[in-house]
Amino acid sequence: LVAPGQAVQIDKRVVVLFNGQQGDDLWQSGQDAMVQSKAVSLDDAQAAQRAYWDAYWHTSDICIEPKDESMAEAVAAEQQGIRFCSFQLAQTYNGGSMRHNIGAKGLTGEAYNGHAFWDTESCCLPFYLFTNPEAAKSLLLFRYNTLPMALERAKMLDCKGACYPIATLNGDEACPLWQHASLQLQPSTAVSYGIWHYVHLTDDKAFLYRYGAEMLLQIARFQATRVGFSEKIGKYGFFGVMGPDEFHMMVNNNAYTNYMGMRALRYAADVLDAMRADAPEAYAALCEKVELAPDEPAQWRHIADNMYIPEAPNHLFEQHDGFFELPHTDINSIPVSEFPLYDHWAYDRIYRTDMIKQPDVLMFLYLYNSSFDTETKRINYDFYQPRTIHESSLSPAIHSILAAELDKMDEAASFFGYATRLDLDNYNRNTREGLHITSIAMAWANIVYGFAGLRSDDTMLRFAPRLPERWKQLTFSVMYRGRVIAISMGADKTVFQLTQGDKLAVQVYGETVELTDEPISVQRQ
């Protein structure tokens, strides 16, 4: 019995374990882990936790300073928002398992049933590429480990190769809506893009030839059997699809789907050519394993070279065939009480206008940014931005990044504020269902790709820093091939310095700059 006024301390130990076991085996593993945990005291655990986060914030913190006192409160909210986002990403996934992916809600809620989407490769991967490259590799190895399921899924769609799922826990397609599960091809091309992005930034040829090439080959096979040839225009295209904009279904020649399919087909053929020259034994083994026909890579190139990309003479891409003919809806005329539209409009009504749920054309202009000139991006941004309703939480950050590139800094700052505080301020009134983890990843990209102007799809890293009006300074670091690049942005200049690793050539405002362990200052242009 406890006497009055007597204090009692109770130590509680909890073991959370997942190793694929079931029943008695899992129970015994838990008991063993509990015994092992007793060798660690609370003080030890706290010290290890503190050391982990100290190391993380040392290389991954993002600091924002206000221009003056009148802006301090607003900037403090943005500072809190971006640190919240960074913390949640690091907590959600650290690369410790190749059997798990990043669910749309991470570990914070039950919405989406824990499923991972193509957001992993298109939105989350850049964060890990520049803060924890091994974790980025583990995310791609999840896709390799689930390749057998993707092969089976393609067969269900009467195709060859690998069709990765739109929603999954373990590699199987888990989306119950056929119009999403069967018509959205972007998961497969996102995996191809993710492999390309990872290898492009790390030069990890061992991964590429051991794991990546097989995935790329099977994705290309799927694309080559899912594509169709139009006799009318004499070009290949994808028919009966749904692009990233889920407000339009069963469309033909979605620009994103066609463009990303073209890139996936071409990259697979390029990798096989390089592999045959650099690693002939691995190439021969792969060809035997997948029974590659000698003419397949050439056919992929032929399709890619003749892919229809719906582009108007003024460089405005038509989102899909007939999009320019759709009735226009003024987004500002829709009462706030009718949002979200999925809850208030008839399902088919959403499909009958030129209103867009999230970036579609702008999405591939963002992913392969260096392949398009500034004027093309400006024309498409000016056309599609007013038509986008942002019912996807990923949408604002993509627009902010492109707006910053186009020097539309007021728009960029406005979109950024939404992206960083989406869950903290419960903008979508659904934070109770869990955090928007993949949107949180885009908030990080909003800083690095948006205001710092980083582009990672060219022959070298490129920067074009542009600071929002109310900020005095922005500082952060990124990791790249064993280096840590510290960046301090001011209104008039940006200072670059390597705090780890050998010298590195980058481009800043189009000019080549050599980074060393000495600070180098570049004037704002």
Predicted regions and their residues:
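Helix-terminus loop motifs that line ligand-binding clefts
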Residues: Y93-T108, E134-Y193, V199, K205-R210, ...
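Well-ordered alpha-helical scaffold segments within catalytic/enzyme domains
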Residues: I62, P66, Q88-Q91, S122-P133, ...
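Structural helix-adjacent loops and short alpha-helical linkers that scaffold large soluble proteins
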Residues: I64-Q79, G95-S97, F130-L140, V199-E214, ...
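Acidic/histidine-rich catalytic neighborhood
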Residues: F222-L292
